[in-house]
Amino acid sequence: MAKIENTFRTNINKNEGAPDSFCPLPWTHVSIKGNGAYRVCCHSAASESRGTVQDNNGNNSHISSAQWNDVVNSKMMKNVRSEMLKGNWPEPCIRCEREFKSGMKSRNIYERNILADITEPESYASYQKAKALTKEDGSISNKDFPVTFFDIRFGNLCNLKCVMCSPTDSNQWYDDYNKIWGYKNFWDSGEKIDLVKNKKNKLEPAKNIFEWSDDPNLWKQIYAHIKQFRRIYIVGGEPLMIDAHYDFLQKCIDVGVADKLVLEYNSNITNIPQRAWNIWKHFKLVIMGVSIDGIGEVNNLIRFPSKWWKIEENFKKFTQAEGRFDLHITSTIQILNIWQLPEFIEYLLTNNYSRVGPWEETPVMTPHPVHRPAYLNINILEDSFKQKLIQRFKEYKQKWNSTDWQKEYGDSNNATWEQKINHAKKILDRFETFMYSTKYEEQELIKWRSNSLHYLDKLDEIRGTDWKKTCPELYESMKVWYDLPKGLY
């Protein structure tokens, strides 16, 4: 697939001299969580503050009452901009900091490039422009920096209950959460959400903070800014299940801005209604971040209760669909799939789905490590298992370099193919670095390891899965943890 027409790669040149921490998002975008609260961005949830924006009274800024200008120039957002311009990593940006320092392509670097591709030069928030037009206290004006990027989670409606997820992002998690930990409440943005039994004897929130998509204050502000949008990022839950987002996209078509808009999703692509295909063909480009974490049973275990055959079927539908699509594999790497990671990469390299990573510089996948919950973070793994991983990674990299393998699966004289192979090897190198990036105190490490076994065993009991059979190499290294102290949950 050709690159987007009329791209503005020269925008990247305006980032010369930018500190590592610089990201254009605090200047150009508004982000909304699944509970309707405003946040710094989708990656800020890994921080202690969770990146939640607050008003002058210390309350969470919410779509039902907050105005966009107040959010953009809130104390947190002004501080984030000021810290970035000083060359510091702001507190909400800890996830990008960790990933960048491990050699990964962190979200802030990705945003510098993708926004340069899809934003008119006069609207692009380059480092030079940000430095010139941001006030000393970190505040900005809508005239200088219009909101061109809108990031929204329309609630937590989902059809899966992924291992690394929680009730905040999937309504399928309520009962399992209670059965695993014994809690009848959970927390989101500092608010305690009580769970009660409904008429079907299933747990649900006593006050459903995730049902807000028809709020008139939100739509008033969206429609006031809709003509300046150039990119919309839609997440869930599972966004393709949420009717409100299709109504929103239809409005974009009706007012005549769809052909200027790039849609970006994170979706498990297990459930794509015909309405989606009918709408997508009207937009400039649809970037689909495909949330899969392995092949076959590994993905079925992690993204329960998905079926691998259905995902492969929908990959094929994307290759034939009317419209412009760019699919990225946006995996979350954790203890359950780190062993299969090189095999997963090889699957993507050799299956050659035409719309998966179609651009010359597009990597074969854009994985990110699980930071939280810590009991799934690869940093807690035994050192002996990490050494086995390093050896396994080395063997795969050697295989990908071999002439015989290159002849069978690719064109060694093709620069694009060589670039993808090099990127595949870098993925393994970066995760090798990352799994040594966090040093835990002894008692903390014992807690996370003990929690890990409790968690995975309870999930098997509830769901009828078998993590030990699906991930035998991992189990062999973790079974010594059964001797650790219990009751640390």
Indicate where each model-derived feature is located:
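Core AdoMet radical
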Residues: 147-157, 168-214, 226-243, 255-275, ...
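Short, acidic, metal-binding catalytic loop of nucleotide-sugar glycosyltransferases
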Residues: 253-256, 321
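Short cysteine clusters
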Residues: 23, 41-42, 93-96, 158, ...
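Radical SAM enzyme [4Fe-4S]-AdoMet core and its adjacent flexible, acidic
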Residues: 1-66, 70-71, 109-115, 174, ...
